[in-house]
Regions:
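Arg/Lys-rich, positively charged N-terminal/basic patches that mediate binding to nucleic acids
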Residues: 1-34
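General helical secondary-structure elements
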Residues: 19, 55, 59-60, 83-85
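Hydrophobic residues in alpha-helical segments
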Residues: 20, 42-43
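Short, charge-rich, low-complexity interaction segments located
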Residues: 24, 46-53, 88-91
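Basic/aromatic recognition patch in beta-strand/loop cores that engages polyanionic ligands
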Residues: 37, 44-78
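Low-complexity, flexible helical/coil segments
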Residues: 41-42, 97
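Enriched for short, Lys/Arg-rich terminal
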Residues: 72-102
């Protein structure tokens, strides 16, 4: 199964890479590897991850970094709505649900 980013989620992902790389050279690369491993698991079995508070929105946690990938499946494509840090305000991304509708 393929995936696509909501533009704001793509920005969150890129910001996270830059943040970790600025803290320690190579840590951003580690984050990318962990993120990609999570997406491989999500794309292989998207419905196996728990539902978030919203209907049809799933949450997959990165194992090493404090982030969740919030997504839904529409037309056989995983739509990534947010790459959310665990300490960020819950639900800040909810406005993206309608914007990302297809």
């Amino acid at each position: 199964m393929s995936y696509q980013f909501h533009p704001a989620a793509a920005g969150e992902h890129l910001d996270s890479i830059a943040f970790y790389e600025s803290r320690l050279v190579g840590l951003g690369v580690d984050y990318i590897g962990e993120f990609e491993a999570t997406l491989v698991r999500v794309c292989a079995a998207p419905m196996s991850f728990p539902l978030d508070s919203q209907p049809d929105i799933h949450k997959a946690g990165l194992r090493r970094f404090p982030f969740n990938v919030l997504y839904r499946v529409v037309g056989g494509v995983v739509q990534i709505l947010a790459v959310s840090h665990h300490r960020r305000r819950p639900g800040y991304w909810l406005g993206r649900v309608e914007l990302g509708a297809n």
